[in-house]
C-alpha cells in the first residue's frame, strides 16, 4: 500500500481539501480521506484531477498528422484525406506500428490522457494476407501501451466491405479486411494476452458501410456481452446520403431500428444526427464519441451537443487522427463549436452546474469510462488510481478555487500545466517528463524517415 496527499482534489462529490489517497499494490484506490494529515504520504504539488479517458484513437495516423494541409482540390474532404491515409497504411511494418503507437501514447499521457480506446483496423500484411499470428498487429498495440504505461481498451475492428450493401473492398483496404468468423477468432485469441497485460477488450464495427446487417447480428450473438461496442457513424453527409440510398434510412435511424443499442455502445462522431436521432441516442444511454479536433480538421461538421446534453445524453472525447493530443483543446472546442453554431456563449452546462469547465470535464470522464469499459473516470474507492496533477506554481491555477480552476485551465491554459500523471498507481509522467520519451522519440524519428522518404 502506498499513500499520496493532495491539498485539493476533485472527488465525485466535489472539491475536497487535504485529501489522503491510499493505493493498493495492484493500483486501485483503496481509501480516500479528505481533511486528513500527510504523515508518511507523498505530497503532491498541485490540484489533483481524475485522468481523462481517450475514447477514440487510430494510432498509426499520428505518423501523418499535419501532412494533409496542402490545398489543391476545391472539394477536399474526408474522402480525399482517406486516400492519403491508405498510402501510409500500405507501407507500415509491425515494428513501425509499435513505435508509432508507443510515441503516441507517451504524448497522450503528458497531456493528461490516462487510458485509450484503440480503434484498430490494420490487421494484415502488406499484401493483405493474415500474419502467422492473426493477432500480430493487435499485440503490437498492446505492447506499445504497456511500454508507455497507458491504460488500454483494444477494439479490433470488423471491416469487410467498401460501401453499403456489401460492396467489394478496394485495394487500399486490403490490410483491413476480415470476415465474421475470422474476426470472432481474433477476439478469442486476444482475450488472454490482454487480460495478462492488464488491458481490456471491446467489440468494434468500422461503420455501417463496412459491415452487413448479418455480420452485426452474428458478432453480437457470439457471447461477448461483457464487452463495450464501438462504431463510426454519421460522420460525413455523404455517408448519410449513401445510407439513405441503400436502406431508406439515415445511419443512426437504421441502427436504432435494427439493433438493440444500449449503454455498451459508443457511437463515434454521430456528427449528422437529426433531432429524432439525438433523442434516441440520449434515451439509450449510448456514449457519443466526439473527436473535435479531427472532425474540424476533416470538415465533418458539428455534433448537436447542446441538445444532446440537455436530454441527458452521455459523451466523451477522443483524439482520433491525432492532429491534436490535448485534453484542453478537445474540451475547449466541444464548447466553442456549439457557440459558433448557436452564436451564443456558455452552451454546455447542467441546471445544477453553471461552470462550463466542470460540466465538460465531468461529462467526458463519465462517458469515456463507460465507453472504455474500465473502472476509471473518478477518484473513488475501487477505481483504478488514474490521476493527473496540475502545476501548483502556475499563477492562474494557484489563484483559482474550486471549479474556477477548471475554467482557468480549459479556457485559458494548456497541456504545459499538466505536471504529473499516474496510471494504476504508478507515476508515468513526473514534472512534465516521461521516462521513456527520449528513447521513444529517437525511434519515432527513424520511422518517420523511413515512411516519408
Curated annotation (Swiss-Prot):
Keywords: Histidine metabolism, Hydrolase, Metal-binding, Zinc. GO terms for molecular function: deaminase activity; formimidoylglutamate deiminase activity; metal ion binding. InterPro entries: Amidohydro-rel (IPR006680), HutF (IPR010252), HutF-like_N (IPR055156), Metal-dep_hydrolase_composite (IPR011059), Metal_Hydrolase (IPR032466), Metallo-dep_hydrolases (IPR051607). It catalyses: N-formimidoyl-L-glutamate + H2O = N-formyl-L-glutamate + NH4(+). Its cofactor is Zn(2+). The keyword ATP-binding does not apply. CDD domains: Met_dep_hydrolase_E. The active site is at residues 269, 320. It is an enzyme of class 3 (hydrolase). There appear to be two competing pathways for the degradation of N-formimino-L-glutamate in P.aeruginosa: the two-step degradation of N-formimino-L-glutamate to ammonia, formate, and L-glutamate (via HutF and HutG), and the direct hydrolysis of the formimino functional group of N-formimino-L-glutamate to produce formamide and L-glutamate (via PA3175). Homodimer. Catalyzes the hydrolysis of N-formimino-L-glutamate to N-formyl-L-glutamate and ammonia. This is Formimidoylglutamate deiminase. The gene is hutF.
Amino acid at each position: 500500500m502506498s499513500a499520496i496527499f493532495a491539498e485539493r482534489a476533485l472527488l465525485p462529490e466535489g472539491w475536497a481539501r487535504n485529501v489522503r489517497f491510499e493505493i493498493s499494490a495492484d493500483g486501485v484506490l483503496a481509501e480516500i480521506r479528505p481533511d486528513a494529515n500527510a504523515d508518511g504520504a507523498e505530497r503532491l504539488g498541485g490540484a489533483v484531477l481524475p485522468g481523462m479517458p481517450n475514447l477514440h484513437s487510430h494510432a498509426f495516423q499520428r505518423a501523418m498528422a499535419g501532412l494533409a494541409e496542402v490545398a489543391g482540390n476545391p472539394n477536399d474532404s474526408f474522402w480525399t484525406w482517406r486516400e492519403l491515409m491508405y498510402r501510409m497504411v500500405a507501407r507500415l511494418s509491425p515494428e513501425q506500428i509499435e513505435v508509432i503507437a508507443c510515441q503516441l501514447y507517451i504524448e497522450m499521457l503528458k497531456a493528461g490522457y490516462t487510458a485509450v480506446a484503440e480503434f484498430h483496423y490494420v490487421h494484415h500484411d502488406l499484401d493483405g494476407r493474415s500474419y502467422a499470428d492473426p493477432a500480430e498487429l493487435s499485440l503490437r498495440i498492446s505492447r506499445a501501451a504497456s511500454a508507455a504505461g497507458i491504460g488500454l481498451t483494444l477494439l479490433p475492428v470488423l471491416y469487410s466491405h467498401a460501401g453499403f450493401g456489401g460492396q467489394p473492398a478496394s485495394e487500399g483496404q486490403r490490410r483491413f479486411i476480415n470476415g465474421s468468423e475470422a474476426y470472432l477468432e481474433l477476439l478469442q485469441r486476444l482475450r488472454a494476452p490482454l487480460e495478462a497485460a492488464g488491458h481490456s477488450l471491446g467489440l468494434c464495427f468500422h461503420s455501417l458501410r463496412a459491415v452487413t446487417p448479418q455480420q452485426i447480428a452474428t458478432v453480437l450473438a457470439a457471447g461477448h456481452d461483457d464487452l463495450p461496442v464501438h462504431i463510426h457513424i454519421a460522420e460525413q453527409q455523404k455517408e448519410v446520403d449513401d445510407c439513405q440510398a441503400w436502406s431508406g434510412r439515415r445511419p443512426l435511424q437504421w441502427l436504432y431500428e435494427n439493433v438493440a443499442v444500449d449503454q455498451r455502445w459508443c457511437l463515434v462522431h454521430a456528427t449528422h444526427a437529426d433531432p429524432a436521432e439525438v433523442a434516441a441516442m440520449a434515451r439509450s444511454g449510448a456514449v457519443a464519441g466526439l473527436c473535435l479536433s479531427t472532425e474540424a480538421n476533416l470538415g465533418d461538421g458539428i455534433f448537436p451537443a447542446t441538445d444532446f446534453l440537455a436530454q441527458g445524453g452521455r459523451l466523451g472525447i477522443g483524439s482520433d487522427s491525432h492532429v491534436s493530443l490535448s485534453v484542453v483543446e478537445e474540451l475547449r472546442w466541444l464548447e466553442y463549436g456549439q457557440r459558433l453554431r448557436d452564436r451564443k456563449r456558455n452552451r454546455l452546462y447542467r441546471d445544477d452546474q453553471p461552470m462550463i469547465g466542470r460540466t465538460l470535464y465531468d461529462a467526458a470522464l463519465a462517458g469515456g469510462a463507460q465507453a472504455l469499459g474500465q473502472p476509471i473516470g473518478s477518484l473513488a474507492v475501487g477505481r483504478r488510481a488514474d490521476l493527473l496533477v496540475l502545476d501548483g506554481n502556475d499563477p492562474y491555477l494557484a489563484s483559482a478555487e474550486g471549479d474556477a480552476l477548471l475554467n482557468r485551465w480549459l479556457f485559458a491554459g494548456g497541456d504545459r500545466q499538466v505536471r504529473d500523471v499516474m496510471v494504476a498507481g504508478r507515476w508515468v509522467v513526473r514534472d512534465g517528463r516521461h521516462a521513456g520519451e527520449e528513447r521513444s522519440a529517437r525511434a519515432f524519428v527513424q520511422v518517420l524517415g523511413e515512411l516519408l522518404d
